[in-house]
């Protein structure tokens, strides 16, 4: 397993892509997960500078692991526009040399879907997968509240319903734990489809609401309860023990304050724990 940082961690800071690349390199990250809006802006407004930086990534043993975006598959959406966005993302992913696109399976909980509505979403997800398959790219659905992948049973059911080889999973361990499932058991059941992990933690289940989109994307949002991996309620020692031999990236998805300080400290702790495992 390798570690990546998320550019979304710097969503409220004035920091360049060049600075993020250098920070990742200096602190032992091997990948960068690009937020979709960052990828689009770099392509449209910083093309030449970003092109030079991308050409240097390999020398720094870095890569763009995934573009994380949001594809609207709701029945009220203009699906033609969603397909157009998919085509744009394929262009971006090709430029950034990644084959993974993260999105969500809708915007409401799986229990709130009628069978007919669920089938319409399944059809749309399959069409999106088919489009990206033409570019040899994968669609990663994130396990997340208020989506069709908000529980382990619904996630497994959805994978079977869509039944497309280019549909994969970004396993967010905190959110699968939030659903009431055991994180390690969820990993074992979803393992054939997993292509990426999100690591984050919370001090108490009482604060899970701080990860709701309206709060987490707000510059003045509440960050209470957001803590480093090994200071929270989810047992990451157990999780890392289980997944460390897999060949996937785990993004440290930090949404709180002081992103550089926290990420730097997290990598030191992770490196030290890995060395302890190797030498024990």
UniProtKB/Swiss-Prot annotation:
Fetch the InterPro entries from UniProt.
Answer: IolE/XylAMocC-like (IPR050312), Xyl_isomerase-like_sf (IPR036237), Xyl_isomerase-like_TIM-brl (IPR013022)
Pathway named in the protein's UniProt entry:
Aromatic compound metabolism; 3,4-dihydroxybenzoate biosynthesis; 3,4-dihydroxybenzoate from 3-dehydroquinate: step 2/2; Siderophore biosynthesis; petrobactin biosynthesis
Task: Locate the residues binding substrate.
Answer: 70, 102, 142, 172, 175, 217, 253
Source species, please? Answer: Bacillus anthracis
Cofactor binding, per record? Binds 1 Mn(2+) ion per subunit.
Catalytic residues, chain numbering:
144
Give, from the UniProt record, the effect of changing residue 70 to A: Binds substrate with 10-fold lower affinity
What does the UniProt record say this protein does? Involved in the biosynthesis of petrobactin, a catecholate siderophore that functions in both iron acquisition and virulence. Catalyzes the conversion of 3-dehydroshikimate to 3,4-dihydroxybenzoate (3,4-DHBA).
- Would you tell me the protein name for this molecule? 3-dehydroshikimate dehydratase
SUPFAM superfamilies tied to this protein: Xylose isomerase-like
The Gene Ontology terms for molecular function here are:
3-dehydroshikimate dehydratase activity; metal ion binding
Q: Which gene encodes it?
A: asbF
Q: What happens when the gene is disrupted?
A: The deletion mutant cannot produce petrobactin on iron-depleted medium. In vitro analysis show that mutants grow to a very limited extent as vegetative cells in iron-depleted medium but are not able to outgrow from spores under the same culture conditions.
Q: Which domain of life is it from?
A: Bacteria
Top EC class, one word: lyase
pH-dependence note: it reads: Optimum pH is >9.5.
């Amino acid at each position: 397993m390798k570690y990546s940082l998320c550019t979304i961690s710097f969503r409220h800071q004035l920091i360049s892509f060049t600075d993020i690349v250098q920070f990742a390199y200096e602190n032992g990250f091997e990948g960068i997960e690009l937020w979709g809006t960052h990828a689009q802006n770099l392509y449209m407004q910083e093309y030449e500078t970003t092109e030079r930086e991308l050409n240097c990534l390999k020398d720094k043993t870095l890569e763009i692991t995934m573009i994380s975006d949001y594809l609207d598959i709701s029945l009220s959406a203009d699906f033609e526009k969603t397909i157009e966005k998919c085509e744009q993302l394929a262009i971006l992913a090709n430029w950034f040399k990644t084959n993974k696109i993260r999105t969500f399976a809708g915007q409401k909980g799986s229990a709130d879907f009628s069978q007919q509505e669920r089938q319409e979403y399944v059809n749309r997800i399959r069409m999106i997968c088919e489009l990206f398959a033409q570019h040899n790219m994968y669609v990663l659905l994130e396990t997340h509240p208020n989506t069709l992948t908000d529980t382990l049973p619904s996630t497994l059911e959805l994978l079977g319903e869509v039944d497309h080889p280019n549909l994969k999973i970004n396993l967010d361990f905190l959110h699968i734990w939030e659903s009431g499932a055991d994180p390690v058991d969820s990993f074992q059941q979803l393992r054939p489809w997993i292509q990426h992990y999100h690591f984050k933690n919370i001090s108490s289940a009482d604060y899970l609401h701080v990860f709701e989109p309206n709060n987490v994307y707000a510059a003045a949002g509440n960050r209470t309860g957001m803590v480093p991996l090994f200071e929270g309620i989810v047992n990451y020692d157990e999780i890392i023990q289980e997944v460390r031999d897999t060949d996937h990236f785990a993004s440290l998805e930090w949404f709180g304050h002081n992103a550089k300080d926290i990420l730097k400290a997290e990598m030191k702790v992770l490196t030290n724990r890995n060395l302890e495992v190797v030498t024990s």
